[in-house]
């Protein structure tokens, strides 16, 4: 007969050893020991009523230490029991999960990259239609100053306002102001002259020719000063620097204003004024639209939308101006 079988038939094998049951049994024994010790100390302190203040203080300290030990054991047993349950569950359910389970704690604080990123600055790449651009124009030796600025205005399709200029010019033809009956005399100056003052404006076509003009004041070599409106070429004797500003919009206003346009609505604050009636305001708006639709009106935009007829100075104004 097999000795193993004979031994198994006589007595059963002992149950397997579990670390969990051993730890729980050890913790229970420790708790019972400390509870028994605490009960004995409490009975001794209740029976001893003749102790001094020092004895009472020592007894109180012993009580506090005992209660702290009991609380620590209870906390440790609870935390260890949780750990044992967690690991035990992972071992028992390992067939279903196939690995060890680890507790993951969510990190505190904001996740990386979640801060408010700085916004890019707002950059306006297109200028306003009413903006003025400043230009420093340098005109070379022997070039016509008037023709150079007029070509710049025509190619860029922008109005140019000449504010000042420095340099020397030669062979100037100007119209000097005359008396009231005569329009003035045209004078041709030969030689080299220094620019004292230079001003004027240039508008691209089809703007009226009267809107374009240039005035200059010159100083001669002997101290004489002459000036007037330039009616011919203005040749540069060396480099000439012109300070100018360009614009794309221009509101054309014809002065003096008509009587309907001069009437402005009165704000009724004291009770004596009266506002214009709606029919009168409608007639005024219609009159302004008719004036702008004619050949004498210059629309605000100069970029090819101007439709004006080239006229001479005598026939430009449809009606004569009233004397000032």
UniProtKB/Swiss-Prot annotation:
Gene Ontology cellular component terms for the protein in this record: nucleus
Pfam families the record matches: PCC
Annotated spans, Disordered: 1-122, 262-324
UniProt KW keywords: DNA-binding, Nucleus, Transcription, Transcription regulation
Gene3D superfamilies: Hypothetical protein, similar to alpha- acetolactate decarboxylase, domain 2
Entry's localization field: Nucleus
Segments of the chain annotated as binding DNA: 105-117
Composition skew (Gly residues), residue ranges: 88-99
Domain of life according to the entry: Eukaryota
Task of the protein: Transcription factor that specifically binds AT-rich DNA sequences related to the nuclear matrix attachment regions (MARs).
Name the record gives this protein: AT-hook motif nuclear-localized protein 24
